[in-house]
């Protein structure tokens, strides 16, 4: 589930959106595929969908996985129970809308959705891409910031991205 907005109203993005394309390209299934783009939803709908993974947008800078983990309304959602809520990375640009960094987003998402199938060195790919795209060689701390390592700490599979 790509959570397009958390506050003031919950919103998700369904089929026909770049967010749906991203999920499918990474080998996932968008539980919100039946709705349109940026549709207002409620917690009951999220409960009915029972997503295994929740992706948090970058359009709300203060939105973190911890907010969902601490929100009692989300307590019974499988993604929350199993610590599979992820803040999408943001580097030279946000990774959730289509951009020159989208291939990195697809790699990141595939690593998290299918840890048993993929094992590429994402941090190296980020450094290489930023060198090519921006003429910038990020150090380990800069890559941690791109990947929101602190915000995603404790999420399943995130240790492999450190």
Regions found by a protein language model. Name each.
Residues 1-162:
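N-terminal ligand-binding lobe of clamshell/alpha-beta domains
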